[in-house]
Amino acid sequence: MMRILSKWIVAAGAAVAVLASANSSHAQQKIRVGWTIPAEESKYWMMRRPAEFPDLGKTYNIEWTQFQGTAPMTQALAAGALDCATQAPLSLANGVVGGNLKAYIVAQHVFEKPGGFSVYWAVKDDSPIKTIADLKDKTIGISVIGGGTYGPFAMLLKKNGVDPAKDIKLVEVGFAVSEDALRQGRVDAVNMNQPFAARAEAKGGIRKLFSLSEEMPNIVHILEACRADFVDKNPDLVKAYVRDITSGMKKALANREETLKVVSEQLKAPVPVLDTYLLKDNDLGRDPGAAPNFDAIQKMLDIYAATGMLPKMDVAQFKHPTIVAPLQ
């Protein structure tokens, strides 16, 4: 964790520079929101179908900024360059420890459910890598070092005698280019997430090495968090945003056909590929009201603390008494 936290000063400064144009002179009307891909259907609906949300563009506006993963958004939140953003429990907790971030979890996007999809690491069919132990001295791709998938990934490696800090070369490879990186030999193994996993599986030539559910079942992958100072200063504005996140989730689940189009537009992924998994039993899980599962998040924080990745942490610090999905 120290190696990740040592980057905070530089990374936070970079986040401010990247988002310098996102001034907060009209903070009461505008929210600066970070997003990423995949699995943020409520936000994709808000971006692609804004007319479906009566308050959006009228009562308040959103300034959207895309990131590769949750860890850079944590840094941007801590630097005050974002107001709300997609987060993973580990990246958010690292923001508290390394960046003095104070935030509220206001909604939840996706989680791993029994029998559903679990983020996994793949190798080529002809790879000599057969077990996790075989990853020693290999180049491994991960979406973001220190992001949401890093925690259970690192725990699985350690359990199998591989030190993720010393025994492998860990490189950042975005989900969208994971398949290409693997097939071209730039990495020996790489993490796969939907819809890119479905696309790669359809082509063949790769196989699953391990999935995160083997170490940590029922993972809360991504949630929505807002800076506590921003929420406390602008409660009505954030309530409007959380109402729209709630509404967006309901729209996504109620109209799968339109959601396929929305996600296709946002991810530039063909509808036939998305149709193989999106909002089906083999997909990630979604709460119908985008409600955060604080009990599950606490269990994840406890596991991270028990393995030395984080100090002991109480999820209660992330709970706002009234501003949390579902809001009507």
Predicted regions and their residues:
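Bacterial N-terminal signal peptides that target proteins for export
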Residues: M1-A12
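Bacterial N-terminal signal peptides
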Residues: V10-A20
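Sec/Tat signal peptide C-region and signal peptidase I cleavage site
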Residues: S21-A27
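Short, glycine-/small- and polar/acidic-enriched structural segments
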Residues: Q29-V162, K169-E172, D188-Q194, N218
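Pocket-lining segment of extracytoplasmic ligand-binding domains
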Residues: L90, L170, A176-E265
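Secondary-structure end/capping motifs
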Residues: D232-M309
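Conserved C-terminal helix/tail region of periplasmic/extracytoplasmic solute-binding proteins
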Residues: L301-Q328
